[in-house]
Amino acid sequence: MQNGANSRSQEYQGVSVDSRYDPQAIETKWQQSWAAAQLDRTPEADDRPKFYALSMFPYPSGNLHMGHVRNYTITDAIARVKRRQGFRVLHAMGWDAFGLPAENAAIDRGVQPADWTYQNVAQMREQLKQLGLSYDWDREVTTCSPDYYRWTQWLFLQFFEAGLAYQKEATVNWDPIDQTVLANEQVDSEGRSWRSGAKVERRQLKQWFLKITDYAEELLQDLDQLTGWPERVRLMQANWIGKSTGAYLEFPIVNSSDRVKVFTTRPDTVYGVSYVVLAPEHPLVTQVTTPEQQTAVAAFAAEVSQTSELERTAEDRPKRGVPTGGFVTNPFTGQAVPIWIADYVLVEYGTGAVMGVPAHDSRDFAFAQRYGLPVQPVIQPTEGAIAEPWPAPFTEAGVMVNSGQFDGLSSTEAKAKIIAFAEEQGWGQAHVQYRLRDWLISRQRYWGCPIPIVHCPDCGPVAAADLPVQLPDSVQFSGRGPSPLAQLEDWVTTTCPSCGKPARRETDTMDTFMCSSWYYLRYSDASNPEIAFTKDKVNDWLPVDQYVGGIEHAILHLLYSRFFTKVLRDRGLLSFDEPFKRLLTQGMVQGLTYKNPKTGKYVPSDRISDPSQPVDPDTGDRLEVFFEKMSKSKYNGVDPARVLDRYGADTARMFILFKAPPEKDLEWDDADVEGQFRFLNRVWRLVQTASQVEATTAADDKAEKDLRRAVHTAIQAFTEDLEEDYQLNTAIAELMKLTNALNDAPMPGSPAYLKGVQTLVLLLAPFAPHIAEELWQQLGGERSVHLEGWPVLDESALIVDEIPLVIQIMGKTRGTITVPASADRDQLQQLAKNSEIAQRWLDGQTIRKVIVVPGKLVNFVIASP
């Protein structure tokens, strides 16, 4: 400790330490100092345990938003704590840099996607550094860099060689005016192109897929291993994989040798089938449609082809269809059943055909009601029967009726018997089906990772000979026609690596999820020019110990990353099954929002003259006021730069961490930001006092013990808050309690006081790293506070020598005395009876009974006069 420092500033290792809290000056100074000292550089492997802290990397839009700030601040606090607790920590950052916005910028602004992207990366990198985030910038990755995407291409070839990458026809969104393929996000709610306004068509194009379905069962089963993930995320993934156990059943087409094959999870209802539905795109539609129905069927199929899959399968959307005029035979009953086509059946899912059982399925019941189809019940409740006509479908287990030889069985028992009977008769077989479909990775875009395939007339698709297959520079963008790559004949024309004959490059690029499905592996060996990662390094650092990101990535990104990990494990490239041990899905940052309920329009807060009675300045209507996720369209965002300019990064970090538990939504409140700034100023003034008073011996032993207890109570509670669930907000509350205890301490300069101030700064450092560093140097620290060990808990300091004891007379509190914490019942009773309080109230009274509650109170019951 260094005491008696009365000058306004002092020197610490060549860095000036100011005695006035100026956050902007302090933060700039220490950020430069840390960078020069490479304080956050990842250590090489040693005997210490490892900890890999990871935030989901951002798309480089050019500006940070508060959601970014929250995500990265949470992860940074965790990483800083783990470093101080003796772990060697990997904490890196990169950029998910391919994607549609860069192409849109190229079209709208006439700039090259690479120039626009790298400019945004540079801008956001500086913004991240201003937050004091402890990243090892030597491990930075940018997915649009050839140094990165050559390995994305190499990994694609690993899938290709394993038979997990293939091409097939698939439906895409087609803009008939611009003559180009659109991503789903480029199609508005009315099914029109966002740029041309054309009604989007659905077309078939040859696309590349990864066979994720080969891993469906393992992806599902291994969710049980992920005990460090939120239960709702595991459930979302399980539902997305969508395992269904049931059977294939085959219905012979009347007057044909072909059959309609359906999958059902309810074979027990097969006797109640009253119609069969094909997807409009099903290959059998043409065959089963009668001449009389051809016009209606063709018109309906054309209409459905313009409807998105999302619309077709929406739960609240009425299901529509038309009859084909054809029939199948129910092999179980021998009855003819009509064949329909309907919009809710998708050709890509299952067999593209379903059996309709209105009596026992809600969707089928609604469809039957709409089109007057018969309802044939084949399962009754175990107790009693349902009167006909059935008011609603019966979807629970029950007893079989109207089901031939299976009548009287429980529906659960009948399932297995009906499947066995179908297998015996050649009508079907048991089957497990998954909702999960193979991953379509083709994008008809320029700004993506090129697929490293050459198409040869003789050899077919062949892996490119040399990687990376680089994107060409200086491409012209019009927003019309095929992908810009497909229009570059010099780039497309190449030589087959196998036979040497003329061939053409694949012009599709990869889904950006391909790049983000393995970036966490690259961080382990980010500068290696020879390989994506070495096995030693990836197995040393992985799996990620703590992953932090938004719930919006709960399914696709996390599922694809898990898939990548399992495939690369099977290719012998790594030795673990799952990429992320623990997952924290931080809540959204919400802003105060003003909305006119009559017009539905949002009003910016700076147009509100009286926030206590907000009205629309244009109409005079009273506005609704509520918190909602920050967005530009709602005018409720807060620019992080504004907060940093006014209060500094440490205040922003403290507010973000204190306002709400990490997993809960956070409501932005300027008053609370101001409150955190005031708290840091209190800590600043406290340290100024501690650094300028002379060290003394303790004059009051009890006060000294009480303060030591407060300090070690804070260490214990703070550490426990961070240990399991990262309750960062309650950890900061402990800092506030400790600050109050130190401010109230009667003996500044005593050993417990000075130790307490040191401890406060050490605990504050992961959350507010700049001010903590400055204050640590003012307290005489000889090295960075971020290199200091974690405060050590002294459990003996928590022992309480004396406790308060309440004295009650007839249940009414009359006062409190101090007693030894070790006193037993008899001693407590005697101490209470002998106290001045009891003597005063019991004088002349007869004690009838004494109630002792150890550690709390003694109650004297006296006789009535």
Curated annotation (Swiss-Prot):
Keyword entries, A-Z: Aminoacyl-tRNA synthetase, ATP-binding, Cytoplasm, Ligase, Nucleotide-binding, Protein biosynthesis
Enzyme kind, highest EC tier: ligase
Keyword flag Protein biosynthesis: yes
Transmembrane residue ranges: none
Positions annotated to bind ATP: K632
Subcellular location: Cytoplasm
Gene3D superfamilies named in the record: HUPs (3.40.50.620), Isoleucyl-tRNA Synthetase, Domain 1 (1.10.730.10)
SUPFAM superfamilies, per database record: Anticodon-binding domain of a subclass of class I aminoacyl-tRNA synthetases, Nucleotidylyl transferase, ValRS/IleRS/LeuRS editing domain
GO cellular component entries: cytosol
The family this protein is said to belong to: Belongs to the class-I aminoacyl-tRNA synthetase family.
Name of the protein: Leucine--tRNA ligase
Species for this entry: Synechococcus sp. (strain ATCC 27144 / PCC 6301 / SAUG 1402/1) (Anacystis nidulans)
